[in-house]
Structure formats: C-alpha cells, structure tokens
Amino acid sequence: MVFESDTNLMKKLQILSDAAKYDVACTSSGVQRDGIKGEIGNAMSCGICHSFAADGRCVSLLKILFTNECIYNCRYCINRVSNDVPRTSFTPEEVCRLTMEFYRRNYIEGLFLSSGILYSPDYTMELICKTLHDLRVVHHFNGYIHCKAIPGASQELVELAGWYADRMSVNLELPTEAGLKELAPNKSRKNILTPMRQIQSGMAQSREMLGMKGGNRSAYWYTSKRLGRSMEIEEHKITPDSSLIGGRNDRFEEQKNIHKSSNDKTYNLSMDTGKNAILNADFKGRKSEKQIEKTDILSMEEHKTGSNALTMWNKTDISRGFVPAGQSTQMIIGATGESDYEIMSVSEALYKRFDLKRVFYSAFINVNNDSTLPAQVGGPPLRREHRLYQADWLLRYYGFEANELLSEKRPFFNTFLDPKCDWALGHLEDFPVEINKADYNTLLRVPGIGVKSAGRIVRARKSGSLDFNSLKTIGVVLKRAVFFIT
C-alpha cells in the first residue's frame, strides 16, 4: 500500500536529486571515524569506496538539494528564478527520513546536501542546520555528511553547520570576480570568500584544541611542508577565548528568530589581505612576483566587531571536531573567457590561503540554452576539465606550481598531452634522471612515476640498484618514463 505522503516524497526526491546533479561531490570523506555502538553510520566506510555514475556523479552519497527554489538569477543555473521548472522543497524531517532509510538499506554511505536560496540565505541555512542537528542528535546518524554553506548566511549558522557536517563547501562558481558579476550578478566574491575564511579559521582552532579530531590537513599543506614552502594560512591563526572552552557540553537548543538583514554587522567578518591578484576583477594575467604580492586577494576592511573565532564550544557536541574532513569548492569552466593559467592560479591561491582540501572543476553545460553564453559545438569541454584535474593533482601531490605548468605566453594546456609530460618536454635540460641517485622530489617530476612508485623506488634502492625490470615491478609506467630516465 502506497500512501499519498510517500508518493509526494518520491516526487520531491526525483526533482531535487536531478537538480543536484551539477554539484560535484566525487571525493572520499577524509574522516577516520568508526561506527559507535547505539549510533547509525560509519564515516570511514564512506571514505573507502564510492561508485560513480556515467556522468561522474557520486552515487554512494544521497546527493540532493534541500530546495530548488531560488531568489537568484544566475545565467548558468537550471534553478534560476526566471526558469519555468517544477519547484519543490524538502522539510528537515523528510531529509532525515530519506537519509536514514537509504542508509539502512545500504544504498548510500552518507549525505551530500546543497540548496537553492529560499527567501534568504539565513532562512535557508537555518533549515539546513535544523536538518543536520536532527540527523546527528535525534536520529544518531554517525555517517558522512557534506554540506554546502550558503554565501551570505550569518556567521553563527555557518559555524553551527560546521559542528555537525564532516565536510563543507562554498562554491566559488566562476574563477574571476568579473565573470561572477557577468553571469551571477546577485552574488558577490565577498559573500563567497567570507564563509571560506571562517571555515578555514575554525578548522585551525579545532585542530589546535582537539588534535586530529579537529580535522586532518590537506595534501597541498603536506606537499608544501615537504618542500619547505611557507603556507600563508599559518600567518593568520586566531586564538579562541579560553572562557568559551570547558564547562558543560549543553545539547543544541534550536535557535528561533535569528534571521538577520543583509546589513547586519555579523556579515562583516575580519578578513586579512592577500598576495594574489587572481581573485580580483581587474586581473589581466600573472605579472611579476613583486607586483602580485602588493595586490589584495579581496578588498575587505578590518572590522573590530567581526571575528572568525569559534563560539559554540559549550553549545554543541564537539567530539567530531569542526569540519573534520575539510572544505572544498567548485568552479565552472568554459562559461567565461578565463585561461587555464588563470584558473590554476586561482586554485593555487585557494590552497595557499584558505586551506582547501579540493578544488573541483565543472565543464560548462549550457542547460538554459542561453544564446549569449559560449556556444558548445563539440559539447562540454570535458577534455579541458580533465587536464585541469591532472594539473590540480600536480599542485597538491607533486609540488608543481601554476607558473611552472603555464604562463602568460602559453596560457592553455596541451589537449593531446597530460600536463606532466608536457612540462617535461619543455624542460629537457632536467633529464634524463639517474633513477638510482635522484631524490624523491626529482623522481616525482619524471613522467610515468607517481607518488607511490617514487616512494617505492627510494625504499628499494636501499637494497640494491634498480633496472628497468625492477621499475616495472614497482609500478612505474615505463612507456612514459623510459625517455626521461637512465
């Protein structure tokens, strides 16, 4: 027997899961939290194995929008206010029910929750916080949760979501501020970067107070430390007030009537200036390093009343830590005229200044058939998206920098060669590499040698010299590496 309420819920699920398919969530949880007796869910299993649909969606997560209603009119978005599409919204209880029922049936390993803007950023974010609270506290859901932070929402609501979610993300949307103004005039770079900074500062505090429970570091951070590079984020630590820590750990009390106007001082968070021009509207390409250092990443005044310090230590369960799986973001590629060089420079700045775990790249799809947007004769730029992901991997794990891979004179990747091979062919003076003498960082720059195989080479050399057969056994892709090693 099918009840009418169940039928309506399934219709909502069909609409809101389809509306969420353009949000990228294909990543492991990054959380080492086992199952707990009396609770439901295991965040570790979520990080072990994911299944992906043909279009790249992560199907092991229940990936839905809370609502596809939206007050904004972004030209690239299927859910923009001017579109005539079926509209619906979940309630917090419905999201909890779907998540728990799908998890019990082993259909999913966690929840990915994003949303359009219903009435206002604060109103929408409060509904999301209510949903996360009920999942964690009422239903004792211990699985993985990835939650989107709504740009423009109050600092208190963003922090509250961070105590319940494993990962949070704020979509950058487009690489440059000029592109954002052109295609998403209702959004601002300030409203996007403000919660990013808040989450980054909160994670740093959580790590300091809770150790590893406060969250693990990003791959980019570890790579930078290995190479002896300084991370700009470490220059801006915030020390929490000791009076906020300790005492009784009160259960969350649902906050009502906490909506704030867009002019509320809560939005004016303290933001330090940066050293990269690439997030400014007037960016014309990377110039000299000295000139870049004098350019702010975002022009924001310092406000004495604003603070990124965590304030809810005694109001929530802090055992999970604050956003322990880190934060990520997503950029649409190909909707505006940015070069690959500009895009990778933006990503590099985000890794350095906001401690991001991942930057996701989404090939532009003209879902609205907007004639003013770039024509897609050959379909979405999927190969370009793939090259950006490969280059992003080189930044995070291999120690490359954006200005090594590309330049103003050569601002786009070679579509026929992966970025690492392309770089090697442009730097033949560094090759061939003596496989039995080269250090770990040098080995990483050899095409065909990855992070694991480079480590195996270093360890295997302690037992004797290596030949090509040994390298093949280790896992080196010889058909690429053979031209660059000796």
What are these regions (language model features)?
Residues 368, 472-486:
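Low-complexity, acidic/Ser/Thr- and charged residue-rich accessory regions of DNA metabolism proteins
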Residues 119-241, 245, 249-398:
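Conserved AdoMet/S-adenosylmethionine-binding subsite of the radical SAM
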Residues 100-114:
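Short Fe-S-cluster ligation motifs
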Residues 64-93:
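Canonical Radical SAM [4Fe-4S] cluster-binding loop centered on the CxxxCxxC motif
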